[in-house]
Amino acid sequence: MNRIILFFLSLISYCAYSNTYIGIEYGYGAVNHDYKVNYIQDGVSLDPDISNGKVSLFGGYQFTEQFSLEFGYSFFKFEDDYSRTIGTISDSGRDYIHEREWDARVNADQFYIAPAFSFYFDGQKKWKANIKTGVTYTQYHSKSMSYDQYEYILNDDIEFMINRHSNERKNNEIGFLIGTGVDYNIYDNLWLGLSISYQIDEFSDSTLAGVSANYRF
């Protein structure tokens, strides 16, 4: 009986600190990966880099004032391209500018789960430091292609393309992430934050600085 009472009191204490939160984050930084595309005969090498940053949606359940479990989804992509003017050609009485294009890109969908720890460092509980570390699952879709583009000299809306080469592959990778940052309670249950994170798996690793907003219920 005493154990049940103690458990019940512990549960009440635990629930007093329990709440959920949702948020959005934008990050940008440096990325390394193993997807390099070399067109040896053309003398062209492509090394896709992160474009438009990394957008993340996240949510979590705060078990205590210091500990929560967070889930998130992120989308990001790497891109690189190169073009070269070959010359002009005539076809059906029209003159066209002949350009050769090379393109390589990677689209990534990432999911993560991470325990997170928070610590207030002011008396009013407006500022807090965060650290999280967890596991990622990322689906990479890589695609490279080369094609010839012919654009009518007198009207660039008239054009056609001929594919020279295309290749694609998919990778599913388990990885690791760690991140830290600070949040500020700007209004009521709304928090704004700055963060830095590092993520690594067999396909890529990244170091990103981010800004975020989250709402706690």
Show which residues each predicted segment covers.
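Short glycine/proline- and aromatic-enriched beta-strand/turn motifs that initiate or cap beta-hairpins
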Residues: 16-63, 69, 75, 111, ...
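Repeated loop/turn-to-beta-strand initiation elements of outer-membrane beta-barrel proteins
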Residues: 20-22, 66-71, 124-127, 184-192
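Cleavable N-terminal export/targeting peptides
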Residues: 1-21
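Predominantly the C-terminal beta-signal and adjacent terminal strand-loop region
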Residues: 76-82, 176-217
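Extracellular/periplasm-exposed beta-strand and loop segments of Gram-negative cell-envelope proteins
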Residues: 31-52, 75-110, 138-173, 198-200
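Residues on the lipid-exposed face of transmembrane beta-strands in outer-membrane beta-barrel proteins
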Residues: 24, 57-61, 73, 113-119, ...
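Detector for outer-membrane/organellar transmembrane beta-barrel domains
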Residues: 23, 27, 111-120, 126-140, ...
